[in-house]
């Protein structure tokens, strides 16, 4: 092994240790009793040895309103991901393939949305949703997440890379625009679709500020909001329970990133072209 490879290996090893050490520590603490954690949280090394080992924290978390929060987060994240993927793919196909009036003006305008913080729109969104009666509802939670300029950009770049001969051959065979889009272009755009879906699911699942503003009723809280409001003020008393909830809340996004990693990387690579 050359010196350069050895140096790269040790750099990567150190980076992995820096990243994994707090993760392993948090996982270990989540399997320790709350009463014990109140006395020993200042001892860093103690956290790596879950003795006595217990799953009581996970049971307590599920016995509260945790299942309601998880269900709300799943509904919001799945609905936002499904509709955003459809709308972004349609918009991307239109910008990449259809020569309509104003396309060269509208597309940069859409991309300009990447530079606008979402929090800047909370007041007008909250006012409009209040007038429409959409606050404290699942629709009101996921509807603002449907306008994603990033997804439109990824899909547009991907469709631009598909040879036009594919569409021309389909037109010769008698296919119309919708048939070309759903039967030809969408199957070819699976990597880009997965990229948009994973990024949007993670954003919707981890979103905190908008659900906090939009949903004031307890039964409409998402996972992040519920954990913050119910356990945040009692972190010292229920540290193990809080950490158990944190571990559970991160599992869906970690699973998606690991399982669909190859699609995600391909989609990002295409978006940089």
List the predicted regions and their residue ranges.
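A structural signal for multi-pass alpha-helical bundles of membrane permease subunits
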Residues: 4-273
């Amino acid at each position: 092994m050359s010196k350069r490879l050895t140096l790269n290996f040790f750099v990567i090893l150190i980076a992995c240790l820096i990243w994994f050490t707090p993760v392993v520590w948090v996982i270990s603490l989540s399997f320790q009793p709350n009463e014990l954690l109140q006395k020993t949280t200042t001892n860093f090394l103690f956290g790596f040895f879950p003795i006595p080992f217990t799953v009581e924290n996970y049971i307590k978390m599920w016995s509260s309103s945790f299942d309601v929060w998880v269900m709300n987060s799943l509904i919001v994240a799945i609905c936002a991901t499904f509709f955003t993927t459809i709308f972004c793919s349609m918009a991307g196909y239109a910008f990449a393939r259809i020569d309509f009036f104003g396309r060269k003006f509208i597309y940069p305008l859409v991309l300009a949305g990447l530079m606008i913080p979402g929090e800047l729109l909370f007041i007008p969104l909250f006012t409009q949703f209040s007038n429409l009666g959409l606050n404290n509802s699942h629709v009101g939670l996921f509807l603002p997440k449907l306008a994603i300029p990033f997804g439109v950009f990824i899909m547009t770049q991907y469709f631009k890379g598909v040879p036009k001969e594919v569409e021309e051959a389909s037109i010769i065979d008698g296919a119309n625009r919708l048939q070309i889009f759903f039967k030809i272009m969408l199957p070819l755009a699976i990597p880009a679709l997965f990229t948009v879906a994973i990024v949007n699911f993670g954003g919707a699942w981890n979103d905190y500020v908008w659900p906090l503003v939009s949903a004031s009723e307890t039964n409409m809280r998402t996972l992040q909001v519920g954990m913050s409001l119910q356990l945040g003020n009692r972190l010292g008393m229920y540290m193990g329970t809080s950490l158990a909830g944190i571990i559970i809340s991160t599992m869906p996004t970690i699973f998606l990133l690991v399982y669909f990693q190859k699609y995600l990387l391909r989609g990002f690579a295409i978006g940089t072209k």
